[in-house]
Amino acid sequence: MQGGREVGRESVSDLAEELGEGSLHPTAGGQSGDSLERRRIGYDGPVILPDANANSSRLDEGLSSSRPHPGELGGGWGEFEGFQESSAKSEEFSQSFELLGRAAECQPLRTPSTPKEGGSCQVQQGGPWVTGTAAGPSSESILSYEKVFRLAFQEVPVEQATEDVCSLDRFLETGSEETAPVPRLCSESRKLWRALQNTDTVSASRCLWSESHCRENLFPVLGIDAAQKSLSGDQGHDLEGSDCRKPEDLLGVSGFHLHHCKALIQTKLSGTSGSRQGSLITYSLFLKTPLQGNGRYITIPQKKIFTPRNLKMAFFNNNVC
């Protein structure tokens, strides 16, 4: 038993010295001789404890199968090989960046007059869209935004069109020629207005009322209810159901107040009867006002409801003709 243990210890120690990776030591004091402690620096692998009854060939075979890759372990706490490789790669990158920087520095120093030297790089200005001979880069900047836009977007000449556009000063100026024109009065409205003004003479007050469309337009302007007008043509014919009284007779009527008169203006038509051309009329206006309480209406004859100016403006502004 002791001979087998010694052979196992010698083979393990020899193998550890060859690899230079770790060593197997017996436990302190030699008290536990059956178990061996395997110490490793920089490797976390499975610990193999050889059996006392196993032969040396089986122990060697187990250690060789669990042996790690030589590049995976370092020599103790030495320098890490991966870090050295990364530093070498960084040096290669720094060299490549220095070469690119030198190539970029030589570009702005080039002028169109200098001859082309061997190994020097020259950038064609204008981009791939420029046709013809390539112009050399300027000393200020190789690719300026202004030149790029001018080459990409060509300027197209546009003809200057003269438009008749009024300026603001022309609108603000008030000249005599820009005054609003006075509306011309219709000739038929003038004839009607003259006929209404001259009620004394028969020739001036007569007009062809049935053939004129002024009749339909005049009644709404005067506020006359066209459904209740009388076209009988009798002289002095009053409206049906109207109680015609003089203003002084209305003073004794209870509940009558002149300021409460809200007008429904009607007319009494008069003219010559038997005319083939229709009724020739003169006008008389009546103010119809209600009585309080009974719902009856009193018609008050008023011949000057409208002033001449107001009546004239009502005629011409409402297009009676």
Swiss-Prot record:
Residues 1-85 are annotated as: Disordered. It comes from Rattus norvegicus (Rat). The lineage of its organism: Eukaryota, Metazoa, Chordata, Craniata, Vertebrata. GO terms for biological process: intracellular transport. One of its GO terms (cellular component) is trans-Golgi network membrane. GO terms for molecular function: clathrin binding. The gene is Clba1. Residues 53-67 have a biased composition (Polar residues). Pfam families: Clathrin_bdg (PF15045). This is Uncharacterized protein CLBA1. It comes from the Eukaryota. Residues 1-12 have a biased composition (Basic and acidic residues).
